[in-house]
Amino acid sequence: MSKKVKKTRRGHGEGSITQRKDGRWQGSVLIGYDPETGRQKRKYFYGKTRKEVQDKLIKIIPKVQTGTYREPTKITVAEWFTTWLNVYMKPSLRPTTWESYRYQVEGHIIPALGHLRLAQLQTAHIQRLYNKKLKSGRLDGRKGGLSPRSIKYIHTVIHSALEQAKKEGMIIINPAEATKLPKQEQKEIKYLDAAEAAIFLATAKESKHFAAFFLALNTGIRRGELLGLRWQDIDFKACQLTVNQGLVRVTGKGLIFQEPKTKLSNRVINLAPAVLQVLKEHKAEQNEIRLLAGSAYNADLDLVFANELGEPICPRAFTRIFERVVKRAGLDVTFHGLRHTFATIALEQGVDVKTIQETLGHHSAAFTMDVYSSVTAKMKKEAADRVGNLLASLIE
């Protein structure tokens, strides 16, 4: 049975305030109209005193009048992030990027914040998540926390999802905006100098994957791009290769080929005569393997670097092969370090930064300069020393 209410005179700018039969006060304000029925939509407030209700109305009325009021959503963080991930992100992201986002959402974000209503999510909630993950946030069972870089990636996902919610009027401000991220220390880049590169190549020559290692060292090409390379991507007459796809592993799908992540990653790389010669020799050897395999060989994939049946080489398996070669050579470098080795040697040989940036597929020359700042600083010092020594010799 509904309770009767006692109407009182409406105060200036209060909206509507009434006193209930049980003694409590009730306030309401018109916030809009139902688009389907045309009926009024009102927001109700309750309090023990008239002033308590009046104060609540005073806060909301200006927002209603200026069109900035948003009715708090009842959707939870878990519900919204799941919707955002599958409805908004999946159609536009590369499979590997989407999989990475899903891992962050399901592994880190929902377990910590999923129970909260989206409208209740505050900066402090998100900041506590970052702080906790920094101390003990690993999901692989190992001790210790996540790196500042990993925290920044989680932040990117959270900020993006909340920004979409803000655009849709589900929240007024993005609470991730005011969080403070841990400082990222620039890691020292490990690469091979010219002498070490020579040792690596001498050792790698014993491997059947020598052509792949030689190409990587001469171009700075990424692992996935290397393993996704097709013969049709190599122009022996123009002495160039074109990066059109990469090989990646996606959970639930296995190994797949996908387009480069950016337009700049889809690039043309010039090849030196020595590289072309190694590739020609590799192709001749591959043709022999293909003849032995017969119809079992997957020639349709047209892969430059494939297994004995023409199928893709698993990126992780390829990395393990590389690591064994490095160990035999007595060196300490990752496969990605070959990319840094190429860039460093190119810089030291006087190749301009713009050319290196385009070859590596970096988004800007400034980024390339930032990544190799320690190398360029060393080069500048050496140049200054050479000029200084030359000028000093003139006054002796």
Predicted regions, residues:
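Basic/aromatic DNA-contact patch characteristic of tyrosine site-specific recombinases
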Residues: 1-75, 79-91, 96-103, 128-131, ...
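C-terminal secondary-structure termini that scaffold catalytic or DNA-interacting sites
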Residues: 1-4, 238, 251-275, 281, ...
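Short, basic (Lys/Arg/His-rich) helix/loop patches that form interaction surfaces
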Residues: 9-10, 139-144, 201-207, 219, ...
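C-terminal catalytic core of Y-nucleophile DNA break-rejoin enzymes
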Residues: 43, 50, 96, 238-242, ...
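Catalytic-site neighborhood detector that most strongly recognizes the C-terminal catalytic loop/helix
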Residues: 48, 183-187, 191, 246-247, ...
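Short, Lys/Arg-enriched alpha-helical recognition elements, typified by the DNA-recognition helix
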Residues: 56, 73-166, 178-181, 301-304, ...
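Basic, Lys/Arg- and aromatic-enriched nucleic-acid-binding interface segment
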Residues: 142-148, 152-154, 165-231, 236-237, ...
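Short, polar N-cap/turn motifs at the start of nucleic acid-interacting alpha helices
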Residues: 233-240, 331-332, 351-373
